[in-house]
């Protein structure tokens, strides 16, 4: 497998792993680390929790899901660092936000008890808490990534605004809500999604998008041999065949 001649560092920032990492989303970080290493890069991982100092420069940003209580814990801090995250998003830094952080990257999340958590507005989406839980295996189709699979488990229902582009279209499952057939949202290189499982182990094309985008932004190019994703493909096949 070809790789950069000299080790090149890629900095990966994980947002709020202490409070927003209860559905196995840490697996996304593990996939990015391993694939960076396979491609010959040196991953530098920074864990950011409430009250920490945000680094000046990053190459990839990821964040996971949590309970409503977890969102409330991080909310004020997220609003504080929101302008910096906005700037990074506008610059084209690749990001992956899952479930709870996907919701807070939108305009707001209105909980079932009518508490409104203001979002940072990177994604043109709005989320409303409901009594209906959307749970089960999900299969979607993306123009950019092909078939994307995962597991959804959320009671918040998210609706896209006019400026939002869906991450994928639902083939089996619910997606953002129980009405329109959209899953997730994209702004530039920022992806928001409800797919757990974790999403990246079974969808290496999405992981490689984050890595390739980061490498090209930082070093101007991305050249490598293909990784043998045989086991990921096997997992995908099994997951696709599972009932809802």
Q: Residue ranges of each PLM-predicted region?
A:
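N-terminal beta1-alpha1 cap of cysteine-dependent amidohydrolase-like domains
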Residues: 1-87, 201-244
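Conserved beta-strand scaffold positions in the cores of enzyme catalytic domains, especially
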Residues: 14, 45, 122, 150-152, ...
């Amino acid at each position: 497998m070809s790789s950069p001649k000299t080790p090149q560092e890629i900095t990966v920032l994980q947002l709020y792993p202490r409070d927003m990492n209860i559905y196995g989303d840490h697996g996304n970080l593990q996939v990015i680390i391993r694939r960076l290493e396979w491609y010959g890069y040196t991953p530098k991982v920074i864990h950011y929790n409430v009250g920490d100092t945000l680094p000046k420069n990053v190459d990839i940003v990821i964040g996971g899901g949590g309970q409503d209580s977890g969102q409330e814990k991080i909310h004020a801090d997220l609003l504080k660092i929101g302008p910096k995250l906005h700037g990074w998003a506008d610059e084209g830094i690749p990001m992956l936000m899952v479930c709870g952080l996907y919701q807070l990257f939108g305009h707001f999340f209105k909980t079932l008890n009518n508490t409104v958590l203001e979002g940072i507005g990177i994604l043109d989406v709005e989320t409303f808490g409901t009594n209906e839980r959307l749970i089960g295996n999900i299969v979607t189709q993306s123009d950019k990534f092909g078939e994307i699979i995962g597991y959804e488990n959320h009671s918040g229902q998210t609706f896209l605004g006019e400026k939002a582009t869906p991450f994928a279209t639902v083939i089996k499952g619910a997606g953002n809500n129980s009405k329109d057939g959209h899953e997730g949202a994209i702004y530039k290189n920022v992806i928001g999604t409800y797919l757990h499982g974790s999403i990246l182990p079974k969808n290496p094309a999405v992981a490689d998008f984050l890595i390739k985008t980061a490498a090209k932004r930082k070093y101007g190019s991305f050249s490598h041999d293909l990784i043998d994703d045989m086991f990921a493909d096997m997992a995908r096949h099994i997951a696709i065949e599972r009932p809802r």
